[in-house]
Amino acid sequence: MKLMTMPSEFQKALPILTKIKEAGYEAYFVGGSVRDVLLGRPIHDVDIATSSYPEETKAIFNRTVDVGIEHGTVLVLENGGEYEITTFRTEDVYVDYRRPSQVSFVRSLEEDLKRRDFTVNALALDENGQVIDKFRGLIDLKQKRLRAVGKAEERFEEDALRIMRGFRFAASLDFDIEATTFEAMRSHSPLLEKISVERSFTEFDKLLMAPHWRKGISAMIACQAYDYLPGLKQQEAGLNHLIVSLKDNFTFSDHHQAWAYVMISLAIEDPKSFLKAWKTSNDFQRYVTKLIALYRIRQERSFEKLDIYQYGKKMASLVEDLRKAQSLSVDMDHINTLDQALVIHDKHDIVLNGSHLIKDFGMKPGPQLGLMLEKVELAIVEGRLDNDFTTIEAFVREELAT
């Protein structure tokens, strides 16, 4: 198969391939970018594979950076762009089902492609637009099928994260997993416990943000892979609820909303501990935990002005999106009205602060000062007090007198 027109991302990188070939080596576009252009999808990263060894690659170009030279990768800075160029390689026995004990550089494109995970990711493209397909990836691409390169069992024993990648590709590409590949994923799912939580989180996160995320979750359920992921053991019922409880065309607006609804579906009682088990950042934990709290408030009643002040309009909108996807009542106009009615959106918007209370009223730093500031803040939010210096002073004077 030959591309009639090279996409602009590849055209810009063609001089790189030309230089390498002029130096006497082979060079091809490889991986996800080739797959995506054949599917008519946007291209993100342009990866280049070559028969030149790293030191040979560095000798061809003036500006290079060793970003992963032990694995054969050199970053080339050329024509205003950055390109990762990786030497054809084979990989020895894998350690702990996640990393090769040794990487060997080779001159053969086919040897390089056979170590890749799925046939649709094992395609290469030359400078003339000719697709090199050694493992029937084009047929799988046409039939929207995800199939492991070579023996599926070996691919997943080499790197068990490929199981999670399989779920993610099913979700992002809307592909079905080929039967033999699926069975190997199912039988090797226990190996996911060997994978770093951070790597599993990245794949699960991408799955949740994919347009066909239900397909990825369904495959995970069918493989019983969830039993080997943090906080998901024996959570088949919760994961099924996650799939069926939202409208078919619903996709998550952002990562916070996605993980919040996962925990809502699983009825997780301690969201922070759940997210800690996934080794997420403290900021992520705080935001998602607040989002779940606001969701539960909304399940009980309509939003009030104080809710919008404390949680924010954006977070309230994420909650309403989830309610709409469940065919529950929503009222974005009410949220907008409450937000517009807020005199302040943050305590720093208040014209008077703790320093003023210390200076003008002789208050001392401590709990009493903090409590007074909270009273001022609440009174302004609820509309009982104007955000005016003189008015606030009078309010404080009255509070201190009682």
Curated annotation (Swiss-Prot):
Keywords: ATP-binding, Magnesium, Metal-binding, Nucleotide-binding, Nucleotidyltransferase, RNA repair, RNA-binding, Transferase, tRNA processing. It is an enzyme of class 2 (transferase). It holds the Pfam family PolyA_pol. It catalyses: a tRNA precursor + 2 CTP + ATP = a tRNA with a 3' CCA end + 3 diphosphate; a tRNA with a 3' CCA end + 2 CTP + ATP = a tRNA with a 3' CCACCA end + 3 diphosphate. CTP binds at residues 32, 35, 116, 159, 162, 165, 168. Its EC number is 2.7.7.72. It comes from the Bacteria. One of its GO terms (biological process) is tRNA 3'-terminal CCA addition. HAMAP family: CCA_bact_type3. Homodimer. A single active site specifically recognizes both ATP and CTP and is responsible for their addition. This is CCA-adding enzyme. It comes from Streptococcus pyogenes serotype M2 (strain MGAS10270).
